[in-house]
């Protein structure tokens, strides 16, 4: 089972090079097994694009299932965000910078409940979720 990040779901809903790359990555993942989104991705995409209940139909048509975040994943996400903030402070950067809880929840869900994550944010997920298989949709240039 592989999870899909919010950025890739948004790409799937588009009509450009990124959409084509996301569709290709999704097709390859579906050939290997179930593909899921967690509750965080559903809420992020729903809030950002306002799809509401139509979003569920869109996911089902694409072959993407729903997988809620388990308690152990939520705990790991909190631990990873704490480490992230400590690292920023140690490096002299603002600890409230950039990464919010949803990023860590998505990563922890993929690491502990799935076998990988399809995302455009390769660097962050490889850095903070060691051992997580990261699949990056590639556009044809």
Predicted regions and their residues:
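Acidic, PIN/NYN-like endoribonuclease modules and their adjacent C-terminal/linker elements
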Residues: 1, 107-141
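Short, well-structured N-terminal submotif of metal-dependent ribonuclease cores
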Residues: 1-37, 46-64, 129
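Histidine- and aromatic-rich ligand-binding microenvironments
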Residues: 4-5, 37-38, 98-100, 121, ...
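A generic structural signal for short hydrophobic patches within well-formed alpha-helices
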Residues: 9-10, 42-45, 74, 125
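Short, contiguous strand/loop micro-motifs
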Residues: 13, 42, 92-94
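Aromatic- and histidine-enriched alpha-helix N-cap/loop-to-helix transition segments
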Residues: 40-43, 47, 105
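Short, hinge-like loop/turn segments at secondary-structure boundaries
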Residues: 52-56, 84-86, 135-138
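Active-site neighborhoods of divalent-metal-dependent phosphate/nucleic-acid chemistry enzymes
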Residues: 65-116, 120-122
């Amino acid at each position: 089972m592989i999870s899909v990040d919010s950025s890739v779901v948004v790409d799937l809903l588009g009509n450009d090079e990124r959409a084509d790359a996301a569709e290709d990555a999704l097709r390859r993942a579906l050939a290997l097994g179930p593909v899921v989104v967690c509750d965080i991705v559903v809420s992020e995409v729903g809030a950002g694009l306002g799809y509401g209940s139509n979003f569920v139909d869109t996911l089902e048509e694409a072959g993407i299932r729903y997988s809620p975040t388990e308690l152990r994943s939520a705990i790991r996400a909190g631990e990873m965000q704490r480490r992230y903030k400590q690292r920023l402070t140690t490096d002299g950067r603002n600890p409230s910078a950039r990464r919010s809880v949803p990023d860590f929840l998505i990563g922890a869900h993929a690491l502990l409940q799935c076998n990988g994550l399809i995302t455009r944010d390769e660097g962050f997920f490889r850095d903070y979720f060691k051992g997580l298989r990261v699949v990056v949709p590639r556009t044809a240039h």
